[in-house]
Swiss-Prot record:
TM stretches of this protein: none
Binding site for NAD(+): G137, V138, G139, I140, N141, P142
Gene this chain is encoded by: oxnad1
Signal sequence bounds: none
InterPro entries: FAD-bd_FR_type (IPR017927), FNR_nucleotide-bd (IPR039261), Oxidoreductase_NAD-binding (IPR052128), OxRdtase_FAD/NAD-bd (IPR001433), Riboflavin_synthase-like_b-brl (IPR017938)
Domain FAD-binding FR-type: 20-123
Keywords: NAD, Oxidoreductase
Protein's name according to its UniProt entry: Oxidoreductase NAD-binding domain-containing protein 1
EC number: 1.-.-.-
């Protein structure tokens, strides 16, 4: 989710479930994820703060009237281990994103409130599912959180008692420089090639694709044929996040493979 447009985030998500409590947070690191995206690490010290993989935060900035809405791109495991969450925010003139890119610094104080009905939070008694994650542009953020959570579940099966099946990520961007988190995504696929796979799609790549990305990268949009290969109507649970036209096209393609509509979950970014 993004606060990219002028449409008010709180108004747009008024009917969506969110927590009641606001939590103070401190910016403890800022990383340039790409030429246009900054990744913030926020320390949230309160022991009651929690979120599910895929959810977003209302983002309150002192002195800025507009409230932002940004998907959490880190896993619940990072919060448990280090007391931190991460947000990856693309540059925009919308006040919260503009503040992050032009004024935010380490030790800046903000406040966050968790919300969203789009998440992956399996319980030990749930049936095993294969995950199909389909992202367009910065729609990768909540899906990256879900991917990291799935990887954590595979690493720590002894403590959670739920292990997902196979996870495949389809991630489309204009070019390879705009593919966020690509190195970590590839590392996860290398770590457990039996459980994780990915395809990067580039739609406006003008240069040669870097050698290390070539095995994973396809020129052109995500196709119905690729989706078909990763769909089992009885096991697959699909999460989509991206611009509305992509969501509509991919949802239609998935339903044509026989995947039930209630197994296709999506969040549109504006």
């Amino acid at each position: 989710m993004t606060s990219r447009r002028r449409t008010d985030h709180l108004e747009r998500t008024a009917s969506v479930h969110r927590q009641m409590e606001l939590f103070s947070a401190r910016v403890c690191d800022i990383i340039s994820e790409s030429d246009t995206v900054k990744r913030l690490r926020l320390e949230v010290a309160h022991p009651d703060f929690s979120f599910r993989a895929g959810q977003w935060v209302d983002f309150f900035i002192p002195g800025v009237d507009t409230v932002g809405g940004f998907s959490i791109c880190s896993s619940p495991g990072l919060l448990k281990r280090e007391g931190a969450i991460e947000l990856a925010v693309k540059y925009a003139r919308h006040p919260p994103a503009h503040w992050i890119h032009t004024e935010c610094s380490v030790d800046s104080q903000v406040a966050v409130r968790v919300g969203g009905n789009f998440y992956f939070d399996p319980q030990p008694s749930n049936p095993v599912v294969d995950l199909l994650l389909v992202a367009g542009g910065v729609g990768i953020n909540p899906l990256y959180s879900i991917l990291l959570h799935a990887a954590d579940l595979h690493r720590h099966t002894h403590s959670h008692r739920y292990t997902p099946g196979h996870t495949h990520l389809c991630y489309s961007a204009k070019n390879t420089t705009e593919l966020l988190f690509k190195d970590t995504i590839i590392d996860i696929c290398h770590e457990r090639p039996d459980k994780f796979s990915c395809h990067f799609h580039v739609t406006q790549q003008s240069s040669d694709i870097e050698p290390q990305l070539q095995p994973y990268t396809i020129r052109g949009r995500i196709s119905a044929e690729e989706l078909q290969r990763y769909v089992d109507p009885e096991r697959t649970l699909c999460y989509l996040c991206g611009p509305p036209p992509m969501i509509e096209k991919v949802s239609s393609d998935l339903q044509s493979t026989g995947l039930p509509e209630d197994r296709i979950l999506f969040e549109k970014w504006w």
